[in-house]
UniProtKB/Swiss-Prot annotation:
PROSITE patterns: BHLH, PAS. Gene3D superfamilies: Helix-loop-helix DNA-binding domain (4.10.280.10), PAS domain (3.30.450.20). The gene is NPAS2. This is Neuronal PAS domain-containing protein 2. One of its GO terms (molecular function) is protein dimerization activity. It is found in: Nucleus. Residues 9-59 form the bHLH domain. Its main location: nucleus. Residues 311-354 form the PAC domain. Residues 1-10 have a biased composition (Basic and acidic residues). Residues 1-61 are annotated as: Sufficient for heterodimer formation with BMAL1, E-box binding and for the effect of NADPH. The lineage of its organism: Eukaryota, Metazoa, Chordata, Craniata, Vertebrata. Residues 82-152, 237-307 form the PAS domain. Expressed in the retinal photoreceptor cells (at protein level). Expressed in the pineal gland and retina.
Length: 815
């Protein structure tokens, strides 16, 4: 029994110790589980131990890397870490660290850029450095950044190994709370080296594409960047404390009604740096920024009227000569016996610069700066259709791109209160204030000036003007990149995305309007060209109607006996004159200068009320045609008739052949009817298939030249053409008036004979070979001309004849 009791006691003691050990182990596991991140579910002991082991391994790796990169020189205090020492050095040097790719994209910037230039790091990242530089410095900075990239692989690797320090000065844009303010640039100094980097995501380079071409870019595993320390050329004694390590820090104070310090909380010295006895009795306005004094005065008046309220965000000068952003809730306390105001109780809360900027821009109606000045300038010039003005708008937008496209703005330092020794950075000579770039104004007269300028150009030039597609120039320059601002609230991120999409939509709509306007302009220009062509054709028709018509009439003629026509065998003309009988009241229509008639090399013949007449000039043709009498005046037209029949009451007699009719007409003298001068045509050669230019030149020479008639009274025959004056009038013989229509149709199928006339050279040499026409009274000829001139001008109806070029296909006559 005793042994059993001893065993039970030992077992109970052992179980109790085991339970205690297990409980202690479970407590430790729970502590480890609570320290692990992301433990949303209950984990077993094995999982907790695995995660703890992984964390310890990573921690050891990081510690080893930190020890390797730790500064071991004596000039760094041992009690400061690398981050702390770097921050202190940057504050002492008035500088910040920046890493820029060879294309200009900013991949890293330190937080110290905010107190120096007023830009938040989130606003500068993924931007192009050229966005923050003046236009005149773009090319020079680009060459410096891409100098290492344009080398060969071996040269670039040697450049990274050696001491490749690069140092240059430039102007960098300052940030501002109000993006509509004129841009101000700070003169800074870059000192850095080219380094290789990896595991950095590719940036979007808002505002600029990568400046280095793809052929010169390094492979993804060997990327080069420029790491530099940026310093202000002129030291800035007053900086803004924009980065708040512990937000929502606050302290209290009491002020008199004149806003003098009466009390200061113990929490104030770590924030503002002043001890209570240092500020008691001093006015609170001595510590405020000069740009915020007006707003604070309004808040003070509001407080005196209503007894409580909340101030705007303002800058308070700390003991370390830095500006810290505060916001104050205040109220007035009254005396408990007489209810008179005693003092003002204030609760000051520290706010960050990012929150201040969001609040200020919301007050100004600018939640995000997604629409730049370039976009507004292009929208203002949307009504302009002139491609030159469109290019000017793009050039102006590119010139102000560095000043207006960046969304990162901040408030620059300004003159401070007079009780502290300060220097105003805004008034330093190293600042470069950009000129005011006014947006393009919309002009209503641009379209009118454009139309007037284009209408003044020749029609041929307008027809040959190619349309200038502005859409080819727009994709890279018309669409500014909208920037997403990193904000703590998801609502702000959504508003930024919505603003970006709205901006892109506006840009696309603007491009659509420009394309539609360009299409309308092209349609208007085409319509104007068609109207001008119609005007030219109408003017040619009016000129044709206004020219005087020639009436050729033959009357009171006695038919003589047929005379044989003597021809010289040795002189044979190369061109033949084909004559046809005419009736009184018939005219010859002038040659129209229309372009279509000239292109077709055709001529116009007129039709009278009783009969139709056509004259034909053939060169080397043996095709049988109807014999017609060709009479040339200053406005006589040349036409070629087809093989179709032509009927009229004045046809020739049945028993009389064509050869006899010609001899009857040419056997009589015409000296009484011949004027002193006539218009002659003096070309060297006339072909029935000649070109348009030669034909038009011959027509002008035919109307301009004048020659004197010979003493023998024979008509002037030039190159086979009989030239007569307007006053010359003839009629066919009386026997030809009795020819019936059926015989006229039969007569067309008879064999035609061509009357060969001499060239001008043979006419001048021998008078015996000249052709003689029937003589008529000049009074009768003139009377017939004047009687029928007015009638023929009203009855003149031009018709198009066949092309003269068809005669080239005719067989050659026998010589």
């Amino acid at each position: 029994m005793d042994e059993d009791e001893k065993d039970r006691a030992k077992r109970a003691s052992r179980n109790k110790s085991e339970k205690k050990r297990r409980d202690q182990f479970n407590v430790l596991i729970k502590e480890l589980s609570s320290m692990l991140p992301g433990n949303t579910r209950k984990m077993d002991k094995t999982t907790v131990l695995e995660k703890v082991i992984g964390f310890l391994q990573k921690h050891n790796e990081v510690s080893a890397q930190t020890e390797i990169s730790e500064i071991q020189q004596d000039w760094k205090p041992s009690f400061l870490s690398n981050e702390e020492f770097t921050q202190l050095m940057l504050e002492a040097l008035d500088g910040f660290i920046i890493a820029v790719t060879t294309g200009g994209s900013i991949i890293y910037v330190s937080d110290s850029i905010t107190p120096l230039l007023g830009h938040l790091p989130c606003d500068v990242l993924d931007q192009n450095l050229l966005n923050f530089l003046p236009e005149q410095e773009h090319s020079e900075i680009y060459k410096m950044l891409s100098s290492c990239m344009l080398m060969t692989d071996s040269a670039s690797s040697d450049c990274l190994k050696t001491d490749n320090e690069l140092e240059f000065y430039c102007h960098l844009l300052r940030g501002s709370l109000n993006p509509k303010e004129f841009p101000t640039y700070e003169y800074i100094k870059f000192v850095g080296n080219f380094r290789s980097y990896s595991n950095v995501p590719n940036s979007t380079c808002n505002g600029f594409d990568e400046a280095v071409p793809r052929a010169y870019r390094a492979s993804p595993g060997k990327q080069i960047c420029f790491v530099a320390t940026v310093r202000l050329a002129t030291p800035q004694f007053l900086k803004e404390m924009c980065i708040v390590e512990e937000p929502l820090e606050e302290f209290t104070s009491r002020h008199s009604l004149e806003w003098k310090f009466l009390f200061l909380d113990h929490r104030a010295p770590p924030i503002i740096g002043y001890l209570p006895f240092e500020v008691l009795g001093t006015s609170g306005y001595d510590y405020y920024h000069i740009d915020d004094l007006e707003l604070l005065a309004r808040c003070h008046e509001h407080l005196m009227q209503f007894g409580k309220g909340k101030s705007c965000c303002y800058r308070f000068l700390t003991k370390g000569q830095q500006w810290i952003w505060l916001q104050t809730h205040y109220y007035i306390t009254y005396h408990q016996w007489n209810s008179k105001p005693e003092f003002i109780v204030c609760t000051h809360m520290v706010v960050s610069y990012a929150d201040v900027r969001v609040e200020r821009r919301q007050e100004m109606g600018l939640e995000e700066v997604s629409s730049e000045v370039v976009s507004s300038a292009l929208k203002d010039s949307g009504s302009s259709l002139d491609p030159e003005q469109h290019f000017n708008a793009l050039d102006i937008g590119a010139s102000i791109l560095s000043a207006s496209r960046t969304p990162s703005v901040s408030s620059r330092s300004s003159p401070k209160s007079s009780h502290t020794p300060k220097s105003d950075p805004a008034s330093t000579p190293t600042k470069l204030t950009a000129e005011a770039s006014t947006p393009l104004q919309r002009t209503s007269s641009t379209q009118q000036d454009l139309s007037a300028h284009r209408l003044s150009q020749p029609t041929a030039l307008q027809a040959s003007l190619p349309s200038q597609p502005s859409c080819e120039l727009l994709p890279q320059q018309l669409l500014p990149q909208a920037t997403l601002q990193s904000q703590p609230a998801p609502l702000a991120q959504f508003s930024a995305q919505f603003s970006m999409f709205q901006t892109i939509k506006d840009q696309l709509e603007q491009r659509t309007r420009i394309l539609q306007a360009n299409i309308r302009w092209q349609q208007e220009e085409l319509q104007k060209i068609q109207e001008q062509l119609c005007l030219v054709q109408d003017s040619s028709v009016q000129m044709f109607l206004q020219q005087p018509a020639v009436s050729l009439s033959f009357s009171n003629i006695q038919q003589p006996e047929p005379q044989p026509l003597q021809q010289r065998p040795g002189v044979i003309s190369q061109q033949q004159l084909v004559l046809s009988p005419q009736l009184p009241g018939q005219i010859a229509s002038p040659q129209t200068p229309s372009q279509q008639v000239l292109r077709e090399a055709s001529v116009i013949s007129s039709q009278g009320p009783k009969a139709e007449r056509s004259t034909e000039l053939t060169t080397g043709s043996s095709r049988p045609t109807r014999s017609t009498a060709t009479l040339f005046g200053p406005s006589t037209s040349l036409s070629r008739r087809g093989p179709g029949p032509s009927s009229g009451p004045g046809a020739s007699a049945a028993g009389c052949s064509h050869d006899q009719q010609l001899r009857l007409l040419l056997s009589q003298p015409i000296q009484p009817m011949m004027p002193t001068s006539c218009n002659a045509r003096h070309p060297s050669d006339l072909s029935m298939a000649g070109s348009q230019a030669k034909y038009s030149q011959n027509q002008q020479m035919f109307q301009s030249l004048e020659v004197q008639t010979s003493s023998s009274g024979s008509p002037i025959v030039l190159m086979g053409q009989a030239v007569l004056n307007q006053g010359f009038a003839t009629t066919p013989p009386s026997q030809s008036s009795s020819l019936p229509p059926m015989q006229l149709q039969h007569q067309q199928h008879q064999q035609q004979r061509y009357l060969q006339v001499q060239t001008p050279s043979s006419l001048h040499n021998e008078q015996t070979d000249s052709l003689l026409l029937s003589s008529y009274s000049p009074q009768q000829g003139n009377m017939g001309y004047h009687q029928t001139q007015q009638q023929q001008q009203q009855q003149q109806l031009p018709r198009r004849s066949n092309s003269l070029s068809e005669s080239s296909n005719l067989p050659q006559p026998l010589r």
